[in-house]
UniProtKB/Swiss-Prot annotation:
Cofactor note: Binds 1 [4Fe-4S] cluster per subunit. The cluster is coordinated with 3 cysteines and an exchangeable S-adenosyl-L-methionine.
Catalytic activity: 5-amino-1-(5-phospho-beta-D-ribosyl)imidazole + AH2 + S-adenosyl-L-methionine = 5-hydroxybenzimidazole + 5'-deoxyadenosine + formate + L-methionine + A + NH4(+) + phosphate + 2 H(+)
Function: Together with BzaA, catalyzes the conversion of aminoimidazole ribotide (AIR) to 5-hydroxybenzimidazole (5-HBI) in a radical S-adenosyl-L-methionine (SAM)-dependent reaction. Is thus involved in the anaerobic biosynthesis of dimethylbenzimidazole (DMB), the lower axial ligand of vitamin B12 (cobalamin). Requires BzaA for catalytic activity, as BzaB alone displays no activity.
Origin organism lineage: Bacteria, Bacillati, Bacillota, Clostridia, Eubacteriales
Name of protein: 5-hydroxybenzimidazole synthase BzaB
């Protein structure tokens, strides 16, 4: 029984109770959101963990981080360190995107050491194994692809990015679109090559009901991958992207009817003046299910600083209804992130999420911001550290300058808080 089917029966599960407690809402609010598909709770029935999060309407914007091996860097211990950093810095979920030597071992390690929601992209492993077995990923059979999905579900993955919304109608729109960047999704490119080589429909689209049955058995959340997402601001909201979103909406309806929790993966590169429109289209076409975005990157000209461009776009998107932000690190478009990149990526994306969450007056983020402001006036460093998004950094700065009044701009003798306290009695 999935969380969604339980909710539709009027049952409030233990996971719904936990989400309600964390979010400061009623369990009934969470149950109703899950029943409608507006909230998902990534929690595979075969995986035990303490940290539960809800993603969707009326809840705080959540943050996802990425890790995983590759053929260029196959260091499982480094990926374990990255995963620990992700969790320590406050990520709500992670995705293991491994394509290195032993993908199974890497995934099992990630599931074992983490205590947050775990996601993956099954077509990555299926493609790597097809290269080993058939000499090319286009030799992958449909059964091999679905067997990989089922294996990863049975091992405990809480959510999966699966590129089911790629079909010939989307590729035909792409060919006519005059795009700058064509296909930038790794999973999307694998399946595009498979379709053209085999002259067949995408099996994840054609046999979508088979996919739903696999996911339903373990209550793994379906994240409909954005196989045709724009890879440049110039391509945002082109015909290919919109056609992909239309197909995603059709599949969303079928997932909801089957009682499978579902969210939509979005772009990517979106200029600020198109963020509201992008969000409105997704929510309208996809029945209000949660939107999981990869940024948004607000500009294309800042390699080395894409954690910042992503945070700018992510904050705007969160304000307009995005539910789940995938982090970007300074290494985006440059190479694989190291541990420092991961730390910076989570921190900046958490700032973006908080900027959106604080708009809910009286919510968790608002109350935290208010507590920080009051602590600054009172010069209560302990409370400031407790409410900081990066408490370790703040504490280290305070310890480095123990005699400081806390503000290098004014200094102790001209502190506005002191002036206000003395003459107005308001501090």
């Amino acid at each position: 029984m999935t969380q969604m089917l339980e909710a539709r029966k009027g049952h409030i599960t233990e996971e719904m109770e936990k989400v309600a407690l964390i979010e400061g809402v009623t369990p009934e609010f969470v149950r109703e959101g899950v029943a409608k598909g507006h909230i998902v709770i990534p929690k595979n029935k075969f995986r035990s963990r303490d940290k539960i999060c809800g993603i969707g309407g009326g809840l705080d914007v959540k943050v996802n981080g990425l890790m995983g091996t590759s053929s260029d860097r196959n260091d499982m211990e480094m990926e374990a360190k990255k995963l620990r950093i992700l969790e320590e810095c406050g990520a709500n979920a992670f995705m293991d995107l491994s394509t290195g030597d032993d993908i199974d071992a890497m995934r099992k390690q990630s599931l074992t050491i983490s205590n947050i929601a775990a996601g993956c992209v099954p077509v990555y492993q299926a493609s790597v194994e097809a290269i080993e077995k058939h000499g090319s990923m286009v030799g992958m059979t449909e059964d091999e692809l679905f067997d990989t999905v089922e294996k990863q579900c049975q091992e405990g993955m809480d959510f999966m990015a699966i590129h089911s919304a790629l079909n010939w109608s989307v590729l035909n729109a792409l060919k006519k679109s005059g795009r700058v960047t064509d296909v930038v999704s790794r999973g999307g490119s694998f399946l595009t090559a498979w379709m053209f080589h085999n002259k067949k429909e995408n099996p994840l689209y054609e046999h979508f009901d088979r996919l739903l049955e696999i996911l339903k058995a373990t209550d793994t959340v379906l994240s409909i991958g954005d196989a045709i997402r724009p890879g440049a601001n110039a391509d945002s909201l082109d015909s290919a992207q919109v056609q992909g979103l239309i197909v995603a909406g059709e599949l969303t309806k079928r997932a909801l009817e089957a009682g499978v929790q579902v969210m939509i993966e979005g772009p990517g590169h979106v200029p600020l003046n198109q963020i509201a429109t992008t969000m409105q289209l997704q929510k309208q076409l996809c029945y209000g299910v949660p939107y999981y975005i990869l940024g948004f990157l607000a500009t294309d000209v800042a390699p080395g600083y894409d954690n910042i461009t992503g945070a700018i776009g992510g904050a705007f998107a969160g304000m307009h209804g995005a539910d789940f932000l995938c982090y970007l690190t300074p290494a985006e478009h440059l190479g694989l992130p190291n541990e420092d990149d991961v730390r910076m990526g989570v921190r900046t994306t958490k700032i973006a999420a908080d900027a959106a969450n604080v708009l809910k007056r009286g919510g968790n983020a608002w109350n935290r911001s208010l507590a920080m402001s009051k602590a600054r006036v009172a010069r209560d460093e302990k409370v400031q550290v407790a409410n900081a998004l990066d408490p370790e950094y703040l504490e280290s700065k305070l310890k480095a300058e123990p005699e400081s009044h806390g503000c290098a701009a004014c200094g102790k003798s001209k502190c506005p808080a002191d002036v206000a306290a003395e003459f107005f009695g308001i501090a």
